[in-house]
């Protein structure tokens, strides 16, 4: 039995709220059940030094968790003086995923930074961050068009992300923390609305994942991403 009685192919309650920040050019509060991630998009009219003069823009991301986003308080990484390997891995994943659906040349020599701050964590923070980040990015490029700084949208595709796993021999969609911590295998899928693969991270804990189980996880993820993409568009429409 899954927590809250969910079916194996059921996601948690998904809520995506766009435009939650009065200052950022784009923003989205992504709620995947008990996981809440605030994503904000900020536009800078410059690019990193190594990109100057190249005629292309850049999309990057930063990720972090509030100290009490989890059951016990975690020390702020700024206080520790360095980011954890996990933080660096996740923010690179977010940026890399978003760049897969952006025409950087069409963006022009400007940078969009997506800040993903985990307010509350109950599993799937990176997938919630990617899903909310796309909404914030779309709002930001919409702002550039409204301001006359762009004539067309450089975001040429839609994507979202979801977690899956094998628990007690059963393949399940959208794991929460209690499931994730005892999963025999878990995977994160970043997919486009048309089923294109942007990134897949899959790990076996006790024994290798049979191909049949992976195929089941992939099928669950594809169905979940379709629903997430619909939620993204609904959020942008307000």
From Swiss-Prot:
<dbReference type="GO" id="GO:0000049">
    <property type="term" value="F:tRNA binding"/>
</dbReference>
<dbReference type="InterPro" id="IPR036345">
    <property type="entry name" value="ExoRNase_PH_dom2_sf"/>
</dbReference>
<keyword id="KW-0808">Transferase</keyword>
<keyword id="KW-0820">tRNA-binding</keyword>
<dbReference type="InterPro" id="IPR027408">
    <property type="entry name" value="PNPase/RNase_PH_dom_sf"/>
</dbReference>
<feature type="binding site">
    <location>
        <begin position="124"/>
        <end position="126"/>
    </location>
    <ligand>
        <name>phosphate</name>
    </ligand>
</feature>
<comment type="similarity">
    <text>Belongs to the RNase PH family.</text>
</comment>
<keyword id="KW-0698">rRNA processing</keyword>
<comment type="function">
    <text>Phosphorolytic 3'-5' exoribonuclease that plays an important role in tRNA 3'-end maturation. Removes nucleotide residues following the 3'-CCA terminus of tRNAs; can also add nucleotides to the ends of RNA molecules by using nucleoside diphosphates as substrates, but this may not be physiologically important. Probably plays a role in initiation of 16S rRNA degradation (leading to ribosome degradation) during starvation.</text>
</comment>
<dbReference type="InterPro" id="IPR050080">
    <property type="entry name" value="RNase_PH"/>
</dbReference>
<feature type="binding site">
    <location>
        <position position="86"/>
    </location>
    <ligand>
        <name>phosphate</name>
    </ligand>
</feature>
<dbReference type="GO" id="GO:0000175">
    <property type="term" value="F:3'-5'-RNA exonuclease activity"/>
</dbReference>
<dbReference type="Pfam" id="PF03725">
    <property type="entry name" value="RNase_PH_C"/>
</dbReference>
<keyword id="KW-0694">RNA-binding</keyword>
<keyword id="KW-0819">tRNA processing</keyword>
<dbReference type="InterPro" id="IPR002381">
    <property type="entry name" value="RNase_PH_bac-type"/>
</dbReference>
<dbReference type="InterPro" id="IPR018336">
    <property type="entry name" value="RNase_PH_CS"/>
</dbReference>
<comment type="subunit">
    <text>Homohexameric ring arranged as a trimer of dimers.</text>
</comment>
<dbReference type="GO" id="GO:0009022">
    <property type="term" value="F:tRNA nucleotidyltransferase activity"/>
</dbReference>
<dbReference type="GO" id="GO:0016075">
    <property type="term" value="P:rRNA catabolic process"/>
</dbReference>
<dbReference type="Pfam" id="PF01138">
    <property type="entry name" value="RNase_PH"/>
</dbReference>
<dbReference type="GO" id="GO:0006364">
    <property type="term" value="P:rRNA processing"/>
</dbReference>
<dbReference type="InterPro" id="IPR020568">
    <property type="entry name" value="Ribosomal_Su5_D2-typ_SF"/>
</dbReference>
<dbReference type="InterPro" id="IPR015847">
    <property type="entry name" value="ExoRNase_PH_dom2"/>
</dbReference>
<dbReference type="GO" id="GO:0008033">
    <property type="term" value="P:tRNA processing"/>
</dbReference>
<keyword id="KW-0548">Nucleotidyltransferase</keyword>
<dbReference type="InterPro" id="IPR001247">
    <property type="entry name" value="ExoRNase_PH_dom1"/>
</dbReference>
<protein>
    <recommendedName>
        <fullName>Ribonuclease PH</fullName>
        <ecNumber>2.7.7.56</ecNumber>
    </recommendedName>
</protein>
């Amino acid at each position: 039995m899954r927590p809250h009685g969910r079916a194996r192919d059921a996601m948690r309650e998904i809520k995506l709220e766009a435009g939650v920040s009065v200052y950022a050019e784009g923003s989205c509060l992504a709620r995947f059940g008990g996981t809440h991630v605030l994503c904000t998009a900020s536009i800078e009219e410059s690019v990193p030094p190594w990109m100057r003069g190249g005629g292309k823009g850049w999309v990057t991301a930063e990720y972090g968790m509030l100290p009490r986003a989890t059951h016990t308080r975690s020390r702020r990484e700024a206080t520790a003086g360095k980011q954890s390997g996990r933080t660096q891995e996740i923010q690179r994943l977010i940026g890399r995923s978003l760049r897969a659906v952006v025409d950087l040349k069409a963006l022009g020599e400007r940078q969009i930074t997506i800040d993903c701050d985990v307010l509350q964590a109950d599993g799937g923070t990176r997938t919630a961050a990617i899903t909310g980040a796309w909404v914030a990015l779309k709002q930001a490029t919409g702002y550039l068009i409204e301001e006359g700084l762009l004539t067309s949208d450089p975001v040429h595709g839609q994507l979202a992300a979801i977690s899956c796993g094998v628990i007690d021999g059963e393949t399940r969609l959208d794991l929460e923390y209690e499931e994730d911590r005892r999963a025999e295998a878990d995977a994160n899928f970043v997919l486009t609305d048309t089923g294109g693969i942007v990134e897949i991270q899959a790990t076996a804990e006790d024994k290798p994942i049979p191909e049949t189980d992976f195929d089941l996880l992939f099928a669950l993820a594809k169905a979940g991403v379709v629903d997430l993409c619909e939620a993204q568009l609904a959020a942008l429409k307000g």
